Amino acid sequence: MQNIDLISEKEAQKLLEELADKIAAYNHAYYIEDNPLVSDSEYDQLFNTNLKLEQKFPHLILENSPSKKVGAKIANKFAKVTHQVPMLSLSNAFDEQDVRDFVDRIKNFLRLNEFAPIFCEPKIDGLSFSAVYKNGVLTTGATRGDGYVGEDITANIKTIKNFPHKIDNVPEFLEVRGEIYIEKQDFLNLNKEQEEQGKDKFANPRNAAAGSLRQLDASITAKRPLKYFVYSGGVTEQNLASSQDQLLTKLKECGFNINEISKLASSEEEIFAFYEYLKTNREDLPYEIDGVVYKLNDFALQNRMGFIARSPRFATAHKFPAIIGQTQLLSITVQVGRTGTLTPVAELEPIEIGGVTVSRATLHNFQEIARKDVRIKDYVFLQRAGDVIPKIMGVDFDKRPNDTATFDTPLFCLSCNSKLHYMPEDIIIRCDNGLNCPAQNYERIRHFVSKNAMDIEGLGRKQVEFLIDKGLISNPLDIFFLKEKNDSSLAKLENMDGWGKKSVENLFKNIEKSKNVSLPRFIYALGIRHIGEQNAKLLAREVGSYNNFIAQMELLRTNEPDIYQKLNNLEGIGDKILVDIIDFFDVKENIELIKKLGEILNIEDYKETREQSSLTDKIVVFTGSLPTISRAEAKATAEKLGAKVTAGVSSNTDLVVAGVDAGSKLKKAKELNIKIIDEEEWLTLIKNV
């Protein structure tokens, strides 16, 4: 077989025609005549060659392509793509004060005396993408995914009209980022086609764009009216330009679509004027927008500000006001989460708000129901802002029917019937029955296998529920013995409703694959209360390895003061979260489960992804007022260089940077003979590393 990387377009066309005929013959023999002509591996090699050719030359996809045929073995998932620079989300601003706070944070962080120009642009309500060019040729298209790892959509992105496949006069490696969307009228036309073909309609333009782009068959994507805008670079933007406005000008010259509706603001007044203009005229735009994005225009200043865990410090999204609607509340159901918290949910007469069909809304907590006097059959006001879960704002008392019914706060868990525990002020109600509560156990397993945890594909909500109901799994550990149990059972999983030979084979492969897991993902997968992805990374970074994690958690539960203080010094981990961690490890079954998982999983040690330097893993404390840089900038720089910045001085501290009016921390550092430097020495140090 020819090397696909070197093949010409003419050769590819001929080879695709040959493959189509050959695979069609093999499909007929295999599926119709039950008489395979080639081995599975030989068939797969031919089929994969066809797919790779179509990915490289999507405009050459044939009408009789084997990738379109029912009998063909179409790939069941996209390849993973790791983003060299994370595609983080933006922080939100909901009113003018939030925006002023954003501007003030920039001034304070950078110690600026005047307004730094802000680039303003519409926030398109679409699907984020990354496109990588090597030597000017598009090589990879990817979704944002979880911000760190996305899905390879190269073949699909090449089908979008006017999307450049080749560009000139750019660096050897170039990444651009943007938004793929569907215009309003195209969305209506697409839904009309879906309805005529007896298919489900899309809820909104964003879902339509996402569903169209994430097609395993690129020819389906090609038929969808997708459009795009680029709005930033990734790895190389500073090599192209020194500011956001210059970058967009350069990208436009390269042939990319940019949104011409933008504003370089030189004051807060200009920011708000642009926001009001877009808010007033948003309905006249051909596409959906849900706010305005503000970015520091100067890339050098952006670089100084850097990022926090989930978003850049130098940008924010000013969201448009929430859209209000009214509908009838049909009933109130109660959900039990993986940590036992009970949440009331309003079941509603379906209503369309801002292009989205809403049939459920959050009621937050039981006290909220009483405070707002919400009753079953009431007509309620709903609020929806962006992708936030809709919430009930209040009741239309003028329309209250005579037959409304009040909702009684439960005294016993609806899943396990154990007595509920009322938290302070009755705001939170919790079932403390742990894994003996079926609902908590189910949610815990669902969390364990989820994408950002163990990432076991093929174990969705329905599959987990099925396996629990059939007694095949009762805890996360059972998942890894599922194949062994299935092999020895007379009632095979592949013969049960909703399963098949291929889906079961894929599930077992994915379970096996998941056994190699990073320490942060493993900690997150455990489902400890208040330990989300970021806190899991903080803990993983602190302990370093699985064995250290187990050892330190067991010391923590025995109230070892040094361990408690060390973890308490981590930013994001405080007394409340430490209590939750201790409560989790106080449960004997939890420790046993984690140790057994440790025996069968390959839990990788924490890998530092930040810059490595002489400051890496050094514990640094800043105290007093620094003359020329803000404390926030100093802390951000230290962390970027691999240091751990803590709030308090201890015997573990490596360095104290003391500014003006340094107090007790400086005194303690001297008592412990810890190295102390001033701001000037700090700036020299970071310059040299």
Curated annotation (Swiss-Prot):
Disulfide bonds: none annotated. It is an enzyme of class 6 (ligase). GO terms for biological process: DNA repair; DNA replication. Residues 610-689 form the BRCT domain. GO terms for cellular component: cytosol. GO terms for molecular function: DNA ligase (NAD+) activity; metal ion binding. SMART domains: BRCT, LIGANc. Its EC number is 6.5.1.2. Zn(2+) binds at residues 413, 416, 431, 437. It catalyses: NAD(+) + (deoxyribonucleotide)n-3'-hydroxyl + 5'-phospho-(deoxyribonucleotide)m = (deoxyribonucleotide)n+m + AMP + beta-nicotinamide D-nucleotide. Keywords: DNA damage, DNA repair, DNA replication, Ligase, Magnesium, Manganese, Metal-binding, NAD, Zinc. The keyword Metal-binding applies. Its cofactor is Mg(2+); Mn(2+). The active site is at residue 123. CDD domains: BRCT_DNA_ligase_like, LIGANc. Belongs to the NAD-dependent DNA ligase family. LigA subfamily. This is DNA ligase. It comes from Rickettsia massiliae (strain Mtu5).
